[in-house]
Swiss-Prot record:
Matches recorded under PROSITE patterns: GOLD
Protein name: Transmembrane emp24 domain-containing protein 10
Spans annotated as Interaction with COPG1: 204-219
Motif range (COPII vesicle coat-binding): 211-212
Record keyword Ligase present: no
Length: 219
C-alpha cells in the first residue's frame, strides 16, 4: 500500500549557487589579519588566473599615537616586478586591478619608524573573479530582479568553474608532455651511456691485449 505524496517540489538555483560558492569561496577570497612590527616587511602571495578583476580593502591601525615617525607602505607587484598598486603612508583604502596573465601576485606591507613602537595591526580583504564583482551595482544599472541577479551570479560561478577545469586540463597536458619529453631524453641518454660503456670495454680489451703482447705474456 503506497502512501500519499504531494506534488514534487521544484528546486531553484539557490542550492546550486550555494554549493558553487562553497567550492569556489576559499580560492576567490583572501581575508587575513596580522601584526606588522616596526621596520619590518611582510608579503602575501597568491596565484590568480588571467583576465580577472581583483579588488581589495586594507586597514593599518597605528597604535603609536604619531610617535617615532611611523610610516607604512603598501605595494602590489606581479612575478616580473611590475607595480600594480603602490601607496605611501598607507592607513586605510581600497585598490583594484585586472590581471593580464595567469601569474603569482605579491602584496607587501612595510613599516618604517624609530623608537619603541607597538606592532601595527594589518587587516586585508582581497577578492577576485566572481566575488570581486559588485552585483548590487550591476542590478541597478541593468535593472535586474533579485532572481535575475542570482542567476547572473550563478552563471559567472559556472563560467569560473569551467575556466578552472580548462586550466587544470591544460596544466595536465603540459605536465604530460614534459614527462614524455623527459622519458625520451632519459631513453636517449641510457642508449648513449650503453654505447659508451661498450666502447670503453672494447678499448680496454684491445689495450690489455697489446700490453700482454708487449710483455710477451701472450702470443
Amino acid at each position: 500500500m503506497s502512501g500519499l505524496s504531494g506534488p514534487p517540489t521544484r528546486r531553484g538555483p539557490f542550492p546550486l549557487a550555494l554549493l558553487l560558492l562553497f567550492l569556489l569561496g576559499p580560492s576567490l577570497v583572501l581575508a587575513i589579519s596580522f601584526h606588522l612590527p616596526i621596520n619590518s616587511r611582510k608579503c602575501l602571495r597568491e596565484e590568480i588566473h588571467k583576465d580577472l578583476l581583483v579588488t581589495g580593502a586594507y586597514e593599518i591601525s597605528d597604535q603609536s599615537g604619531g610617535a617615532g615617525g611611523l610610516r607604512s607602505h603598501l605595494k602590489i607587484t606581479d612575478s616580473a616586478g611590475h607595480i600594480l598598486y603602490s601607496k605611501e603612508d598607507a592607513t586605510k583604502g581600497k585598490f583594484a586591478f585586472t590581471t593580464e596573465d595567469y601569474d603569482m601576485f605579491e602584496v607587501c606591507f612595510e613599516s618604517k619608524g624609530t623608537g619603541r613602537i607597538p606592532d601595527q595591526l594589518v587587516i586585508l580583504d582581497m577578492k577576485h573573479g566572481v566575488e570581486a564583482k559588485n552585483y548590487e551595482e550591476i542590478a541597478k544599472v541593468e535593472k535586474l530582479k533579485p532572481l535575475e541577479v542570482e542567476l547572473r551570479r550563478l552563471e559567472d560561478l559556472s563560467e569560473s568553474i569551467v575556466n578552472d577545469f580548462a586550466y587544470m586540463e591544460k596544466r595536465e597536458e603540459e605536465m604530460r608532455d614534459t614527462n614524455e619529453s623527459t622519458n625520451t631524453r632519459v631513453l636517449y641518454f641510457s642508449i648513449f651511456s650503453m654505447f659508451c660503456l661498450i666502447g670503453l670495454a672494447t678499448w680496454q680489451v684491445f689495450y690489455l691485449r697489446r700490453f700482454f703482447k708487449a710483455k710477451k705474456l701472450i702470443e
